Amino acid sequence: MRNDLSGREPAIGDNRGPGSTDGNATCAHGRAGPRCARSQPFDYLVVGAGFAGAVLAERLAAGLGKTVLIIDRRDHIGGNAYDEFDAAGIRIHRYGPHIFHTNAQRIVDYLSKFTEWRPYEHRVKAHVDGMLVPIPINLTTLNVLYGLHMTSVEARAFLAERAEALPDVLTSEDVVVSAVGRELYEKFFQGYTRKQWGMDPSQLDKSVTSRVPTRTDTDDRYFADTFQCMPAEGYEPMFRAMLSHPAITVRLNTDFREARNDFLFKHIIYSGPIDEYFDFRFGKLPYRSLRFVHETLDLPQLQPVAVVNYPDENVKYTRITEYKHMTGQCHPRTSISFEYPSATGDPFYPIPCSDNQALYKRYEALAQQTPGITFVGRLGTYRYYNMDQVVGQALAVYARIEAESCSGERSRPQSAIHREEEAMDDSPLRTATDIPSR
């Protein structure tokens, strides 16, 4: 079986599928599909070729010798981290900026098998009151914004005077107002969050902004993680290397419903939306989507940093990204993208609020009763993960599968949801003004 790479040279795998027939292989509907004679059973069908799916496909093939069919409904691997050269020859991220950062050495060690790294410390500025100032808020932000010359000690006192004491911190608004006061909340967070999430921060769970850093020194790095780098040749080549094992077959432009009718497999790893898998039985889980407008400009550089945020609600986009800052590419022109949040389109972000979590719990309970499938990733577990957290989750799921395989135990079909929280401890969760690691 050839790897379907939309006409490109099929460099992933060796273009062979598993050739033996296994009487234990199953199909959801028990009938042959039009694209396959059902003579090639797979140990695993992996749905989604982003981080969660690619890591598990690679580990199952290389670590346990399993045959894997990995599919994606899009025309490329890499999920939302996919990057490519645009018409001008500039490497861009099709779905907006993806900055790799982590405190987990085990995750760095794993991914380093598939890529070299380019050191990169991400910096973001916010367009506030007609000025570009660092975000997260730091000493420079405060001094520039207010025309002051404070020291770090004075800045701490400045923020303490403005912070509002609240009896309970329950929402995203509460988190920020209790830390920096209402004026800075309104300047930096309120409008941006309303645009990003389509909801007021007072309606969002406190987890959205619970780890927003505020600094009283001049550190203007967006992240404080010990490892901050970009794949030297890009994300797409890294994913290609991950999926190059001969036991892995890749099918693009392939919907899950097609694949489960057309192929034999023993177990499903599913990183798509959990509500979609169950045909929206309890209703749709709310997600935010994004629309990107990419442009190439006839100048070498547009802005001083890779990303500039626009918190003003009168500006319809949330930010502008200039990719050469991140990739280090030398080019006489520059490519940028405008980012517009949307209520419709591909699901990007689970919306964190109590009603949505209650709806997800109903799907989670249903998944726990469904044998033969493991739900992983941001969409499969309806949680807002960073890229490194998704890798950590996938490695933890694999470790469990490996342990059960070595001990002779059968995989736990009744335990279909795998968040693997211990894999998440090294990295903070997403924030309202964070750079999405989609």
Label for each model-derived stretch:
Residues A49, G272-P273:
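Glycine-rich, N-terminal phosphate-binding loop of Rossmann-like dinucleotide-binding domains
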Residues A61-A87:
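Glycine-rich FAD pyrophosphate-binding loop
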Residues F265-K266, E276-S407:
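C-terminal segments that line or cap access tunnels to active or ligand-binding sites in enzymes
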Residues M1-Y44, A62-G65, M424:
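Extreme N-terminal leader/targeting segments of oxidoreductases
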Residues A88-R162:
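Dinucleotide-binding Rossmann-like beta1-alpha1 core, especially the glycine-rich loop
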Residues E402-D425, L429-R438:
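Active-site-proximal substrate-binding core of FAD-dependent oxidoreductases
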Residues D129-H267, S271, F278:
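Active-site/ligand-binding neighborhood in enzyme catalytic cores
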Residues Y44-I70:
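N-terminal Rossmann-like FAD-binding beta1-loop-alpha1 element of flavoenzymes
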